[in-house]
């Protein structure tokens, strides 16, 4: 009988982060609630993404979360049902009139506008292939939002939930999203091959907390919507 699951993830508030010596966050809490309902406790540790993948490779972790599914990863791991869908949007200063058309080449729509992006992060080919003339890299989402307010760039590409969380926490005003461009990614928990029973129990628990309302309660706890 499975009683404990060792999971890893990289720190990414408000989805998983450490506060007052405890790991909390939307994704962490959803996973914890899904497994708790099955009588399984979760032991989560946070590391850089590369360290997380290394721990999975050494089988020192049972699963990794907030991961996208690729053919290569699907060969290595057993993927859960969808944990949630993440969305990244272009943010701008309030009053700056700009909107996008998803059917038109992104670079041509940007013109002379600079875009703030996370260093080392892969978005979509349309964004990743933008030249240095368009992009300014920052090390954190907080730096992206502050850079936007300080006019380092006209647009910042930030996860919707992260932006909402940081703007409330840091009391940042004068920022809103630009319509017409959204990057959506489905996120999962990936379990070690051989732990299909754990994945199955998680999936059942996830369905149950979505049905009984706990899933939505977790999002609201952090000021977010599903």
Residue ranges and their predicted role:
Residues 37, 46, 50-62, 78, ...:
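Short helices/loops that flank or line small-molecule/ion binding pockets
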Residues 9-11, 85-89, 168-207, 225-226:
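Periplasmic-binding protein-like
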Residues 32, 43-110, 120-121, 164, ...:
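Acidic, polar ligand-binding/catalytic clefts
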């Amino acid at each position: 009988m499975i009683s404990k699951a060792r999971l890893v993830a990289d720190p990414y508030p408000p989805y998983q982060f450490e506060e007052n010596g405890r790991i909390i966050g939307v994704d962490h809490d959803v996973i914890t609630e899904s497994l708790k309902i099955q009588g399984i406790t979760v032991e989560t540790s946070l590391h850089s993404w590369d360290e997380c993948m290394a721990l999975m490779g050494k089988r020192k972790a049972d699963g990794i979360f907030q991961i996208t599914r690729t053919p290569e990863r699907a060969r290595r791991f057993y993927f859960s049902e969808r944990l949630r869908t993440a969305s990244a949007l272009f943010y701008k200063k309030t009053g700056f009139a700009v909107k996008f058309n998803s059917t038109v080449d992104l670079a041509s729509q940007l013109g002379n506008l600079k875009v703030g992006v996370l260093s080392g992060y892969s978005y979509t080919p349309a964004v990743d292939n933008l030249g240095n003339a368009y992009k300014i890299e920052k090390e954190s989402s907080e730096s992206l939002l502050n850079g936007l307010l300080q006019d380092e760039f006209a647009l910042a590409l930030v996860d919707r939930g992260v932006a909402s969380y940081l703007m409330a926490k840091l009391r940042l005003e004068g920022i809103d999203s630009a319509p017409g461009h959204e990057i959506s990614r489905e996120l999962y928990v990936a379990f070690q091959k051989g732990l299909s029973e754990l994945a199955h129990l998680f999936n059942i628990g996830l369905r149950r907390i979505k049905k009984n309302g706990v899933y939505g309660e977790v999002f609201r706890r952090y000021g977010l919507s599903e």
